[in-house]
Swiss-Prot record:
Transmembrane segments: none annotated. Keywords: Amidation, Antibiotic, Antimicrobial, Secreted. It comes from the Eukaryota. The modification Lysine amide is found at K22. Disulfide bonds: none annotated. Expressed by the skin glands. GO terms for biological process: defense response to Gram-negative bacterium; defense response to Gram-positive bacterium; killing of cells of another organism. It comes from Nidirana okinavana. It is found in: Secreted. GO terms for cellular component: extracellular region. This is Brevinin-1OKc. Belongs to the frog skin active peptide (FSAP) family. Brevinin subfamily.
Amino acid sequence: FFGSIIGALAKGLPSLISLIKK
């Protein structure tokens, strides 16, 4: 369960960083 949450966070982190960098 927690593994899937961490995976989703790891997937969303790069997009979040790119959004902040914009």
